[in-house]
Amino acid sequence: LTSERVQFAIESAILAEGGRSDDTIVAGGDQACDPHERGHGPLRSRELIIIDIFPRVLKTGYFGDMTRTYLRGRANEAQRQLRQAVFNAQQAAIKSVKAGVEGSHVHQQVLDVFDLGGYETTRGKNGSTGFFHGTGHGLGLDIHETPRVSGLVSAPLKKGTVVTIEPGLYYPGLGGCRIEDVVQVTARGAKLLSDHHYDWEIR
């Protein structure tokens, strides 16, 4: 099984449903430690595999965006803890989404969970490890729209806005993990628009 075969299967299925998805990410092992790496070559058992799809509905022009992390076989304890930390961070961020809340506040929920779990972030000339990207972005007729959900740009989330929530952790040797869903901002909280389970170990 290769990244290319899975990418082809995903993009063919999306096309059959009236969508188009280019540059689908299916990255395993250390390839998954680069959030923008599409992935290539064999998908090995017992390695974390990030699958990120962002299809566009041809009839309306609107984008979707969703990421899940999988593993073929049984995860080791370090992989299990990493995945649980990312899931917990994502759920904490989603729970904090509400009209009027700053995007930086949502981002901080992710940082707090990772800090509590001892997941450090380092940045260097040869790459970064840990959590080194924003928590999310607006989504609509473009794949990346305002507002940004990050610590760099802070603005209140507006009612009706659609945003992604996609924290991740990346450590070469251990692998990468990212979980992403799309939510709509409401006056009472976040309305989950994604509809896919969180099962991740494929046995």
Positions of PLM-derived features:
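Active-site neighborhoods and metal-handling regions in enzymes and metal-associated proteins
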Residues: 1-203
